[in-house]
Every structure is written in C-alpha cells, then in structure tokens.
C-alpha cells in the first residue's frame, strides 16, 4: 500500500466525492493535530496550478484566540462553522508567485525532466505574460489555483474521515491584514472549515448538467 | 455497488488524486462518447458552489470542426492538447446565475429541507450581496465555482480511465464569442482536455507545503 493511502481513512472516490455535502455544524470537541492538518494540506497541494507556480498560501486557524481574531473578517452567517470546526484553513492567493518562475523551471530542466528547447518555450511563452500581467489577471490566476487546491482539500478532509465546508462569505478588505499577510501580495479566496459533522448536513440538489452543457458545432 | 461507482473504472482516490499529472499529448484515435462526457460533467458538478448557484457552463469541443473554431481563441502553446484530446470541456463562468437565486432556495424550502427562518436568513444575507455586486465580484465568484468543478472534472476523468489537462492559456477576449456564448453573461475560466495519454507526462514537484502554511496566533 502506497505511503499516501496509509494516511487515508476512506479511499473510496465515489463516496468521498459524490456523498460530500457542506457541513456547517461540527462537533466542537474534536481536535485535529497540526501534523495531520499539514499532511492534508500537502495532499491537497498535489492539485495543478498555472505553470506549476502554486499561487496559494494557507493560514490555519485552530485555537480559540485565532478564531476570535479570524471572525473579525468573517460574515456572521459563517460563524457556526468557524466556532464549531476543529480547524479552518484559509487559502490566500499569492500574486507574486511568478517571481520565482525562472528558478522553478530551471530546476525542472537541471533535473533533466525537460529539454532546453522546452525550457526556452516555457520561459518565452508565459514568463513575459506574468511579468506584464495586470493586478486583475494575477488575482484571477491565483484565484483559480486557490480554488482547485481548496476543492482537493474538501475531498482530502473526507478521505481523512472528516467533513468540511468552503466559504467565501468574508470581509474582503479586512481578511488579509487580519491573517497577518501582506495585502500587496496576497488576495483572499476561501476558507475551508474542517471537523466531524455534528448533524446531517443539507443535501442540495444540482441542475441537470445537460441544461448547462453545449456542444460546439 | 452504488450507481455512481458503476461508471468508474478507477475508484481509488489516492491513485486518482496523487498520481494525477497534466497530460498534454493524447492518443488522437481515442473517442469518448457524448453520453460518457455528459456523465463525467454531471459527476464533476457535484462540486460545491457559492449559495449552490452552480455558476458554471460547459462547452464541449469534440469534433475537428469545433476544434478548428476553438483554436482561434487558444494560445499556440496549448495546441498539442487541443489537437490530440478526445474532447475539451471549456468551463465558462455564469455571472447571471443569481437571477434564479430566489427560485433555487424557495424550492429547497418547499421540499421541506430548510425552515422558513433559514430561508429568510439565506435570502436576506446573500441575495442583496449578489443583486448589488460589482461585475468584478460576480466574475470572481463564478471563477471559484468553475475552478472547483474543473478540479473535480480532472479527477473524474481519471476515475473514468482517462487523463486530463487544465489550461487557461487562451485569448480572454475572443473565447466567449468563439464559443457562441453571451459575453455580457459569461466569463472564460479554463479548458479541460480529456483523453488517453499517449506518453508519460511530466511529473512536476511541489514546494514543501509547510513553507506555504502559517498558523494564526
């Protein structure tokens, strides 16, 4: 059994994904150790990211003091998850992740994983895009990275035997300073509350996906 | 075995998630039927969305004619995936999804799944936010929804025995009109190329997640 599987309590993809629901009321007595939280973040961070820049940053909120501070930048509607969760992982977008773009891809080349021609193509195509990008594009790019890693964290939490809830009902101005991060570098994206469900969550339905799908002629 | 599991070729979460890599070269001879594509989209759409508004729209590109049209709005760097994939699912954000907000949540109440008090709280908290939202916020909100459903589609593709690649290297002005969608309503987010890998993809490494994690004091 691979190292990764040993960490998982539930390796059943269909159950983890299709029986996932947003839990907003957790058992407040359940603690999750920081080692396990860090492991879950690392597992979630196997998600893809634009140019493998991993434009995400995680702030864990898992003490009463941290929760009190954190709630200053959270909408009241989301207090139940924050109060009862074992931990919240807030995911912020890093709009300066491309500063190390050259190092990241030079290393891939030095490790012999891509050709010089491919390295030049990658550096020639995307690095100029990032170096000349508008703040809006860098926020958009980082928002995508943070959302895909957030989706994996929701699934990884279930695979570790917990439930979770993603929320963006926050104060977008206050959040980054509240977390002690640099507002010039980081943008707020979403919080993921993690813990053991204390009650059966609301099972929402979905539109028929066919009504949201076109086939390009 | 649940209905969902029957569709899956690979229900091993750890393998699907941790052994996933971005494939850019597919076997061009492999076809994926539209029924199976539609099923994969429906399975991916079990993803969460802000207020369950499902602010995503899917356009499938799976014929030579559609690919030729689609490539007019794709960066050359991503032509290999487009040319060789069995299909591309382009995910666009729906910035008008909240127009049906009241209907969505009234139905949840009429189905007896939430109390009147909860309905009033939901409608009172978020509907005004959406009705007064800036275009930027609606784009941000839809981008998150499209990214989480995109992440699930990457995993669902592997669970169906395929591989996939997410890309946003596109022409952001041209894409929506090229897909025949209303640019006043939809915003481009990402394409997901799906097929059978024709060669072993590049295995990228990740930063140590501990270096990207803080614990709020």
UniProtKB/Swiss-Prot annotation, chains A, B:
10-oxooctadecanoate binds at residues 51, 118. The keyword Hydrolase does not apply. Changing residue 51 to S: Almost no change in catalytic activity. Its cofactor is FMN. The keyword Cell division does not apply. FMN binds at residues 20, 22, 24, 78, 81, 165, 168-169, 206. GO terms for biological process: fatty acid metabolic process; response to toxic substance. Pathway: Lipid metabolism; fatty acid metabolism. Its EC number is 1.3.1.-. Changing residue 101 to F: 5% of wild-type catalytic activity. Keywords: Detoxification, Flavoprotein, FMN, NAD, Nucleotide-binding, Oxidoreductase. InterPro entries: Nitroreductase (IPR029479), Nitroreductase-like (IPR000415). One of its GO terms (molecular function) is nucleotide binding. Pfam families: Nitroreductase. SUPFAM superfamilies: FMN-dependent nitroreductase-like (SSF55469). It is an enzyme of class 1 (oxidoreductase). It catalyses: 10-oxo-(11E)-octadecenoate + NADH + H(+) = 10-oxooctadecanoate + NAD(+). PANTHER family: NAD(P)H NITROREDUCTASE YDGI-RELATED, NADH DEHYDROGENASE_NAD(P)H NITROREDUCTASE XCC3605-RELATED. Belongs to the nitroreductase family. Is involved in a saturation metabolic pathway of polyunsaturated fatty acids, that detoxifies unsaturated fatty acids and generates hydroxy fatty acids, oxo fatty acids, conjugated fatty acids such as conjugated linoleic acids (CLAs), and partially saturated trans-fatty acids as intermediates. CLA-ER catalyzes the saturation of the carbon-carbon double bond in 10-oxo-(11E)-octadecenoate to produce 10-oxooctadecanoate, during linoleate metabolism. Homodimer. This is CLA biosynthesis enone reductase. It comes from Lactiplantibacillus plantarum. The gene is cla-er.
């Amino acid at each position: 059994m691979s190292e990764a599987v040993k960490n998982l309590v539930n390796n059943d993809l269909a159950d983890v994904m299709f029986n996932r629901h947003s839990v907003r009321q957790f058992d407040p007595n359940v603690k999750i150790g920081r080692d396990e939280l860090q492991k879950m973040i690392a597992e979630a961070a196997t998600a893809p990211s634009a140019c493998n820049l991993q434009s995400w940053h995680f702030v864990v909120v898992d003490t009463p003091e941290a929760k009190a501070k954190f709630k200053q930048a959270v909408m009241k509607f989301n207090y139940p998850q924050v109060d009862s969760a074992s931990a919240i992982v807030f995911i912020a977008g890093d709009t300066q992740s491309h500063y190390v773009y050259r190092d990241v891809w030079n290393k891939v080349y030095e490790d012999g994983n891509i050709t010089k021609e491919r390295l030049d193509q990658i550096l020639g195509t995307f690095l100029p895009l990032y170096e000349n990008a508008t703040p809006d594009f860098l926020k958009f790019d980082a928002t995508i990275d943070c959302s895909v890693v957030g989706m994996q964290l929701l699934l990884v939490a279930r695979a570790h035997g917990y439930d979770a809830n993603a929320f963006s009902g926050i104060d977008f101005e206050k959040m980054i300073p509240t977390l002690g991060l640099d507002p010039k570098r980081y943008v707020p994206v979403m919080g993921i509350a993690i813990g053991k469900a204390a009650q059966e969550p609301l099972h929402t339905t979905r539109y028929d996906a066919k009504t949201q799908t076109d086939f390009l002629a």
